Amino acid sequence: MDSEFLELTQLLPRWVDLENVVRGEVEARYILKRAADHLANLRSGGDSGAEETGYLVGALVDRNWERIHTGHFSQVPLVTRKIYAIACCFKIFFLLLESTSPAQKDACSEILDEAQLLGCMEDWSELKVALMDYLDKDGAVALNSAPLPTLEPLTRVTSNCDIPQLDAPSLEEFQTKCFEAGQPTLLLNTIQHWPALHKWLDLNYLLQVAGNRTVPIEIGSNYASDEWSQQLVKIRDFLSRQFGKEPSKAGQNIEYLAQHELFAQIPALKEDISIPDYCTISNEDTPGAVDIKAWLGPAGTVSPMHYDPKHNLLCQVFGSKRIILAAPADTDNLYPHDSEFLANTARIDAAQLDPETYPLVAKVKFYQLLLQPGDCLYMPPKWWHYVRSEAPSFSVSFWWE
């Protein structure tokens, strides 16, 4: 047991803090107190009962995993997600007591990813980062995937753009012409300094930095379709299937890493980008944090016509995307879904309009453009947008209020 591991145990929450989280949860109270006491005694030289306590912690993880997967994720009680997250962290410690082999660290890394993706780690961010660093140290598991291609930079093409374009606008110009005017705008030459523009073309770089991490992947034509589903998969497997040198099997599903907080999960990738200064402009007295999302997939990924409630800056790193916009004033003419969970999504297919089924769509003024590498598209809140990738594509979006 190395000294660094013992130092990590110091970051585990004290029982007095956990007690407030699990108040009223009898099973979780018993197991987490036992686990916390065991690891506290470990620092004093005691190590009895580790196997039984570790088993109970694993059972607590499994029980709350089942609760999280019952019903819609948005309706899972926060306490369930917190218990799941901290139980995962304790499970990692007990697994590391058994072994710190590369394979064991890889298994622990997967558990930590699921704690972030399914649980709520906000109260234990310092512990999360320290565990990431410890598990990534010395490289968890050698990547056995076949080498991936390095993508060729796309040659910029002349394309029709139905909205204004601004070349590297100043903050003042952006605030006046875009933000305050509520005007969707294509911004040119604003992220040319990002290392991501050239580093991420080498898919082996992404494989090396993030290949062992687990992420949620969308499977199916788009999230509003009946056959759509999600799975948690290793990035290395996703990259191999969707970008590998071997031709894809006929009929293979398109997979999409969409709307994922990848940069919070893998800080090394965040070093390759930066939050554009435009995101500092706000109507709020105390602007909140900027939400940064990753969008990575092959040609043919589709986000159906939908809107977001926040200001949105969509930045294209590689590949290109065909985008169709519509104003908030046309909301009723776009036939939003009745479902609570799809209320911000239109029933129409913006790429293949069907005026017989949806006659009001004839009233809609659509705006089309091609988003190319290095471009940023500013979309004000509640502007509808349809997005389809024309080539293998990596985009980063910034949402703010």
Curated annotation (Swiss-Prot):
It catalyses: L-arginyl-[protein] + 2-oxoglutarate + O2 = (3R)-3-hydroxy-L-arginyl-[protein] + succinate + CO2. Expressed in neurons close to the dorsal lateral neurons involved in circadian rhythm. Disruption phenotype: Viable. Adults have circadian rhythms with reduced period length and increased rhythm power. Adults also display increased daytime activity and reduced daytime sleep. GO terms for biological process: circadian behavior; G2/M transition of mitotic cell cycle; negative regulation of DNA-templated transcription; rhythmic process. It is found in: Nucleus; Nucleus, Nucleoplasm; Cytoplasm. Binds 1 Fe(2+) ion per subunit. The keyword Nucleus applies. Its main location: nucleus. It holds the Pfam family Cupin_8. The keyword Ubl conjugation does not apply. InterPro entries: Cupin_8 (IPR041667), JmjC_dom (IPR003347). It comes from the Eukaryota. GO terms for cellular component: cytoplasm; nucleoplasm; nucleus. Its EC number is 1.14.11.73, 3.4.-.-. Bifunctional enzyme that acts both as an endopeptidase and 2-oxoglutarate-dependent monooxygenase. May be involved in regulation of behavior and circadian rhythms. This is Jumonji C domain-containing protein 5. It comes from Drosophila melanogaster (Fruit fly).
